[in-house]
Amino acid sequence: MIEESKENSLKYFLIQSVASVIFLASILNQSFSFLIPFALLIKIGAAPFHMWLVSISKSMSWKVLSLLMTFQKIGPLLGLAMLSSVSHLSWLMVNMSSFLLMLVYYVTYLAILYFAVILLQQTPMYSLAQMNSNAS
């Protein structure tokens, strides 16, 4: 268990470091500025760059995972909000009209995620197949 925790910590560190290097390199070199959103999406763990989050979250406790899924996303989400355009997620465009609306959205996201984590922590399910068998 400790070895797996060390491995996941190293994976997280390396992926976040690579994303930070891509982000900084794309800021310094204007010809690669199109890579800024990609670096931020890697840091958030958004699709199609989400596979690192899935592999790391397998062995995490729910408390640590909830921190990873909430507070670690604040910086990159704000960075994406500053780059927002019609092609980005629609809720990011809300930030252009009202910071309060974005704050309400994020607090709602935190509350939903918190209750989902609490529910999943108290239920001994480890796959979607178990969820389906418990429903019948």
UniProtKB/Swiss-Prot annotation:
Keyword entries, A-Z: Electron transport, Membrane, Mitochondrion, Mitochondrion inner membrane, NAD, Respiratory chain, Translocase, Transmembrane, Transmembrane helix, Transport, Ubiquinone
Keyword Membrane included in the entry's annotation: yes
Swiss-Prot/TrEMBL catalytic activity: a ubiquinone + NADH + 5 H(+)(in) = a ubiquinol + NAD(+) + 4 H(+)(out)
EC top class, as a word: translocase
Entry membrane topology: Multi-pass membrane protein
Subcellular location: Mitochondrion inner membrane
EC number per UniProt: 7.1.1.2
Gene Ontology CC terms, in alphabetical order: mitochondrial inner membrane
Membrane-spanning residues: 12-32, 34-54, 74-94, 99-119
Protein task: Core subunit of the mitochondrial membrane respiratory chain NADH dehydrogenase (Complex I) that is believed to belong to the minimal assembly required for catalysis. Complex I functions in the transfer of electrons from NADH to the respiratory chain. The immediate electron acceptor for the enzyme is believed to be ubiquinone.
Name of the featured protein: NADH-ubiquinone oxidoreductase chain 2
